């Protein structure tokens, strides 16, 4: 497992630099190399490949320490306007991006740090112990209910009092809808403690209630869950291709292509929220047959490379 985590982590970092960067920009000259979530997950896998040799309680402690403690770094970052240099930026600093020049025409952009993802990945590794054969479904459901409810409750309480866990406090707005939006507007890049509790809490509750779910909808969800990275790569290129088509249909010319950091994305270009959701649903439906095929292919073939995609 350690070797697999190490090599897959390195593979993800390489893919982020070469394949995913191209998927975001369609720039064969690679004038900007984008380091986002996949590189952060890759670095986290590399770190986990060493941590798994430690005793399980130590691994669990490290995971919780990172998850619960990484927002302590928010204060020095805010006091220095997020300008603490390369190391700090690739480890934790949220918001904006850090530019690392390679030469006069090529740069690496670090959009957010890996630390919080490392904590989540460590706890995910520990979470897998609940799926051992020695743990019954009934036991697992009780534990998941307790964890999920505790996470949701912690989010509501800490967020309500604007306590620890997110650098963006909520505030009362001019109407109820905007106040609710402010309450749930937490930091995703990288995921804050509040974002993690808000998303993983309900997800764990979902696992508690729907482990025995069967039928077409269950197969639909499981298919994407079994080939998540394959879906990620496909959806990135498909959405960017659709963006390129929409760009020219909207009447933009070549002079608007080189908007930075993403090509074919001039500042005023876009659609209303309902259209964004419609496109999102359409992309999922379009990619489902392809993901279904790849899932079946992986299930019937044992080539080592398939475990890396």
Regions of interest found by a model, annotated:
Residues 1-309:
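Alpha-helical transmembrane segments and their immediate juxtamembrane cytosolic regions
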């Amino acid at each position: 497992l350690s070797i697999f985590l190490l090599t897959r982590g390195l593979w993800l970092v390489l893919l982020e630099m070469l394949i995913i960067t191209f998927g975001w920009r369609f720039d064969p000259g690679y004038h900007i190399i984008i380091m986002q979530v996949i590189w952060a997950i890759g670095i986290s896998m590399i770190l986990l490949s060493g941590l798994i040799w430690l005793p399980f309680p130590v691994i669990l402690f490290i995971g919780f320490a990172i998850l619960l403690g990484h927002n302590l770094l928010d204060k020095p970052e805010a006091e220095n306007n997020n300008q603490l240099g390369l190391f700090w930026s690739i480890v934790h600093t949220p918001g904006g991006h850090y530019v690392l020049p390679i030469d006069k025409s090529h740069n690496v952009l670090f959009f957010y740090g890996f630390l919080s993802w490392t904590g989540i990945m460590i706890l995910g590794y520990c979470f897998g112990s609940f799926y051992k054969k020695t743990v019954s479904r009934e036991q697992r459901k009780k534990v998941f209910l307790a964890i999920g409810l505790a996470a949701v409750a912690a989010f509501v309480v800490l967020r309500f009092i604007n306590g620890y866990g997110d650098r963006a406090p909520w505030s009362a707005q001019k109407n109820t809808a905007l106040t609710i939006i402010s309450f749930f507007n937490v930091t995703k890049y990288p995921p804050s403690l509040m974002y993690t509790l808000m998303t993983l809490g309900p997800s764990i509750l979902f696992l508690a209630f729907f482990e025995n779910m069967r039928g077409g909808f269950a197969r639909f969800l499981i298919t994407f869950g079994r080939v998540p990275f394959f879906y990620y790569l496909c959806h990135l290129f498909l959405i960017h291709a659709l963006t390129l088509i929409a760009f020219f249909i909207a009447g933009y010319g070549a002079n608007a292509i080189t908007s930075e950091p993403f090509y074919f994305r001039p500042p005023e270009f876009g659609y209303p929220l309902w259209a964004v959701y419609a496109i999102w649903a359409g992309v999922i439906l379009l990619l489902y047959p392809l993901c279904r095929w790849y899932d079946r292919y992986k299930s019937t073939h044992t080539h080592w490379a398939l475990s890396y995609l």
